[in-house]
Amino acid sequence: MSVPIDRERLVETASSMIDVHSFTGDEQKMGELMVSLYEGMGLAVQWQQVEENRANALGTLAGTGGGPTLMFNGHMDTSYSGREPWLKDVPGFQPKAFVEEGRLYGLGISNMKGALACYVEAVRALQDAGVRLRGDLLIAAVCGEIEKTQYGDAQGAQYRGYAAGSRYLVTHGGVADMCLLGEPTEGKVVLGHFGALWLRIRVHGNFIHTAFSEGKKDQNSILRMHEVLAAVQEWIPTWEGDPSNAYRGAQAIVNVGAIEGGFGWRVSRTPHHSDLFLDVRVPPTKAMGVARREVLDFVRSLAQRFPDYGVEGEVYVTAPGAEIDEGHELVRAVDEAHEQVFGSKPERDVTRWFSDASALSRYGIPTLNYGTSTGLMDVERGENLEIDGLVRTAQTYALVAQRICG
């Protein structure tokens, strides 16, 4: 049964979420907002204090019994703080909601406070229509999903992402028979996504004063890294083109994400080492242990090719991909609900970004990514979503809940 969505209430809810700053590591107040929403809806509330100033907020609409439990999962942390020099003057990347020409703007609206608002409004719509579900319906608002990790001097909660909240969730009672994850998928059904392996490659060199470096440039680790980087660029197409690294027609991809060497405050010294950082995307069909072995074998080949450079490798992120069987009942439910609301069946997709489906699926919770658009393409106005799209997405979620929970 299709239930009406209160457009104004949905916009108000989403706006209240945007207005709460919730950069990774600072999600507490957003969690408190979710709790107040749950309590206003009469949901059972579970508060999970993940660490200081970080929490998960779980709300449960209890069923009458005998039906499957469905989880709506969404992360509260935003990809940016809005204080970055290149974003501070872009209005849609600030934690202040505003509406223009049928679109809702503000930091986090697409990734993924819009989905959280749709979950809330879907449950409210079911309640307003007097729908009683047999199975439990959970809303899990979690911290720490954004793709980042502690490394070197970058320490603290703001760097603890990669499903930190959902890993805590599933080990402290936040489990279900299946999960709908409203990441921004452009309304497509994502049957699987790649995982991420982060690799550091280090090259060593001499640490000497500029005055004594004449004739020793071949011992400068930055200049040595120039050669190693060229070898890495030769290797990247072999990883991306390897059939074992492809998934459902999508190739793997490797990003040269960072390079570090020397001291900007002391360039009177040659750098004793330089580091290159790679983001290597791994298909969900390849075990991370296998991927780790393969990339470190490549590092060993570099060490053999450049025997005087002291080449080393370290894998410091292994975040597996995830997939769901196309025949799963949740996929069928989303197909049917989407077609009812949008007038056609949703397209299939594979993505190379990471999501909390990685943690959830490994805890025995089949998880499907399906949500709104990315909303990140307006470089002048910033992050935004079409309000009509939010309304229809909330309506789709409500239909999915009825089909799954009974």
At which residue positions do the language-model features occur?
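Metal-dependent amide/peptide-bond hydrolase catalytic core
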Residues: 1-8, 26, 200-406
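Acidic/His- and Gly-rich active-site-bordering loop/insert found
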Residues: 2-109, 128-134
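Generic structural signal for helix capping and beta-alpha/helix-loop junctions
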Residues: 55, 79, 143, 147-149, ...
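Structural motif
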Residues: 68-70, 102-103, 137-138, 177-180, ...
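Short beta-strand segments
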Residues: 73-75, 140-142, 180-183, 202, ...
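Acidic-glycine-rich active-site phosphate/pyrophosphate-binding loop
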Residues: 83-100, 192-203, 333-337, 368
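Acidic/histidine-rich catalytic neighborhood of metal-dependent amide-processing enzymes
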Residues: 112-194, 405
